[in-house]
Amino acid sequence: MTHKIREVYIVHHSHTDVGYTDLQEQVIYNQANNIRRAVELIEEGLEKGTNQKGLKWNCETWYCVEQFLKVATKEEKKTFFDLVKKNSIGLSANYLNFNDLADCEYLTEKIHDMQEVCAKEGVTVKTAMFADINGISMGQRDAMLANGVEFLYTNIHTHHGMYPLYQNQKPYFWENEDGKRLLVWSGEHYNLGNALGIVFNKNVNFMTENYFGKAQGDVAGPLEKLHSNLIASMEEYEENGYPYDFYITSVSGVFSDNAPINPAIADTVALFNEKYGEEVIMRMVTLQELYDLIRDKVADAPVYRGAINDWWGNGVGSTPYAVKHYKEAVRLNRICDRLEEKTGVHNAELVKAYGDNSLLYAEHTWGHSATVTNPYDTMVTNLDMRKNSYASKAHEAAAMRKNEQCHLLGDILRYYNLSGKVKAVSTSHEKRVFPVEFYVETMSLPAVKVTDDKTNEVMEVQLSTHPRGVLVSFLAEFEPMEEKTFTYEEQPAPAHTLFTRTAWVGAERVRDIINTYDTESYKLPYGMENDSFKISWKVGEGITSFYNKKAEVEMCRPGLETFFTPVYECTKIRKGVYEERRLIGRNIRGLHAEQYQGDLKDVKVLDHGPVFTRVELVFDLEGTYYSSVIIKMYNKLPKIEFSYHIAKTLSEDIESVFLPLALNLPDAEVSIRNGGVTMRPGIDQLPGTNMEYYLADEGLIYRTKDQTILVNTFDTPLLYMGAMESHPILLCDNREENNKRPVYSWIMNNTWETNFKMDLSGFSEFRYGVEIVDNGSVKEGMERLSDNDKGVVTFICG
């Protein structure tokens, strides 16, 4: 039989997992050595004229090249780049295989640095590849486009995931909002070549059996088996309308991640071509060669815009406490970028320490392959600790950078004076009223007067408790990026005597009588209200109303979608911790999953003053030792801040904890930022992509014809959209109705059976904010959401 496919292009690489197979440092060391070994083998093949002269090696991630260049001799570096120019070694502009936590601003700089390093050697990198991961953010795409990358070769692993466009081995152009395009070849699994038999494996692997069935007494040799597997695959392609005369496959040196180069592949290619070359030719290629070979043949590929939404983003929910720490590191870095606009001082060393560690944390691997099946193993613990250290080191550098910036702006680094001066710095490019808060480390500060030094306005102040003393809060209006200085002065304690001529409070000091003297206190056990919002609750029933007074709309939704009310979900283990999780596929729960909604048991009024009111709603919730939502409502701002306090218990079951963010706004359009690029979930995506859950940079916005409602998710990026039950998975079809599904903050989960943690136990708070603003553009809403994330920087300056 004559086949249309005449050439097989083989991309030999090592899939970069910083972890998974071994300790991170060992993996990094090994990957640098893989490149050194590739240089040696290819050079030897060229010198001796052996089959290895045709050996090609592709560096899947630039990070591994970066590590090699750190340890390589001058001669090794020269030889390496000579082989790149000879198309014996291929380079990829993919820095690491990320999830959507990656800081794309810093990533853009790293890819720029890569191009500068290569340019000095006479090389321009126009290609990139990723393997295993189920997508990259639009911000990562734009980081590549901004640095001259033209071609991306993808190798998606469909374990709990799927490739886009309903089909693999398919080209398309991925276009951004500026009209720039990246040619993408959406390939097969990165071990397809191993499954075919390009690398002989005595132990038949599961992928070969998945693709080609189990051997039935077949005693054919390795070369013959490779031929029969390849022909079977080619026939499948051609029978299904595959239009090209080439076939692309990746291959690893062994069937494993972080695999070394395998010189035997060049021998296999030579032997195959000698025996079967008249039928089909095998050819090892670099990424640049692959791009050159196919680009004209796929010039008519379709053009798409939107996200390749990452199926593996849910893994970040397995480490909610470290992710919270990481999110604050990113926030601190963004704040420092704004403060630098004022100081003009740039600490490149701290920026690099933050950035390099933040990218290592956002690398997709997370933990050891036995994280779930053997959580007791020392290596599992070591990888987990090391992974968390990347977030911590990023946070350390960003926090130190903020200390320096504040000191330059006048921070006296002392918090003890009961009277002094405080500076507040807006990080917003918009004129706005912001809450301003600072604390004084003291046992007692009975009252304080705060005066705006510029206007002499006496601010309305509220004092409340702080873990280290007394918190001082007030509201102030700021011009864009304005620094304001305030004088604060200790005052005598106000006299606390009860007004006794009106029936409003009894001798036991309980304020529960409806009256006109104090029109707020008697309502607080049942709800809270300002000019924009009214929230009502009832012990035993929960939240009964979340009313938008400006739009005159009841925003509270029924059932599990009720705002401010945590939800715990559990799929009991019946078939073992691994198998039960494997069976959920692309769902996030099993068929027998059960949901438990928080049962409101108590209400505590924590603060009530002229600036804000703060109330704690205490819930009984399965899967937790303690569960409460603390709501802080500002009296004179259309703004609410709330935090979920959780003491999570330990379980081997498949668990998730959610906080509903669904609002009864049927005509609203929901938008998020993903890698710095705005998108509408369910709409602005490539067809056939994941629309079950998303990673959002700073939260989401609901945009109606009259208002924009901003919902900040400060500490937890994962959003789930849709039904709270196991269901057939609908891949994205870009319909408007996809954007109308209920939204939940998916705080934590342990749905994976391999490298993402099963243990969710711990204490923490997860913070959120809701603000109503006049309707503007989506861009304006997103900028304000980002401003809310950064807030005002305040410190004592005198």
Regions found by a protein language model. Name each.
Residues M1-L101, C118-A119, F173-E177, R331-R338, ...:
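N-terminal catalytic cores of secreted or lumenal carbohydrate-active enzymes
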Residues M1-V11, D17-V18, E25-I28, N34-A38, ...:
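Mature extracytoplasmic enzyme cores
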Residues I5-D17, T21, N168-L413, T427, ...:
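Active-site and substrate-binding clefts of carbohydrate-active enzymes
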Residues S14, N147, N155, E278-E279, ...:
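Beta-strand/loop-rich accessory regions of lumenal/periplasmic or secreted enzymes
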Residues S14-N33, E60-K70, S92-L107, V123-N134, ...:
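The substrate-binding groove and active-site-proximal loops of carbohydrate-active enzymes
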Residues K74-A93, D142-V184:
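Acidic, His- and aromatic-enriched active-site or binding-groove loops in soluble protein domains
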Residues L107-A146, A232-T249:
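CE4/NodB-like, metal-dependent polysaccharide N-deacetylase domain
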Residues I198-N201, A348, L360-I646, L760-S764:
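Catalytic and substrate-binding regions of extracellular carbohydrate-active enzymes
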